[in-house]
A protein has these predicted regions:
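ABC family nucleotide-binding domain
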Residues: 1-125
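Conserved switch/coupling elements of ABC/ABC-like ATPase nucleotide-binding domains
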Residues: 126-132
Length: 133
């Protein structure tokens, strides 16, 4: 999978990018990006460039970038696919917290253990929607 991170920029700068487009002032941009990286467990990697990060760490930078603008809807395609079990559990815990804060999370996964975290599960089988719960 590709996380569309800017290869020559730090994790922090990559997370700041959508805030830059939204014209958020520099100081607030930095604070919000640092908080997002902290939420995904990467506070100690803020100055690392993508080539200095593991695949799972790059995935978490992409998640931090997705949540930095405080979205009402988060679309996540295989958000734990490149993560080890511990990091995957941390991401699912973060998604649960975001949902508790009012963010709707629409997640696509092939992993039944990850799907078990969802309040509602809809499967596509042979081109048809099947609701499990």
């Amino acid at each position: 999978q590709s996380f569309h991170l800017l290869p020559r920029q730090s994790a922090l700068t990559n997370v700041e990018l959508p805030l830059n487009y939204a014209k958020v002032p520099k100081k607030e941009r930095r604070e919000r990006a640092l908080k997002a990286l902290e939420r995904v467990g990467l506070a100690d990697r803020v100055n690392f460039k993508p080539n200095q990060l593991s695949g799972g760490q790059m995935q978490r930078v992409a998640i931090a970038r997705a949540i930095v603008n405080n979205p009402k809807l988060l679309l996540a395609d295989e958000p734990t696919g490149a993560l080890d079990t511990k990091s995957g559990a941390q991401v699912m815990e973060l998604f649960q917290k975001l949902n508790d804060e009012g963010v709707s999370v629409l997640m696509i996964t092939h992993d039944p253990e990850i799907a078990a975290h969802a309040k509602r599960v809809v499967m596509i089988r042979d081109g048809e929607l099947q609701e499990k719960r």
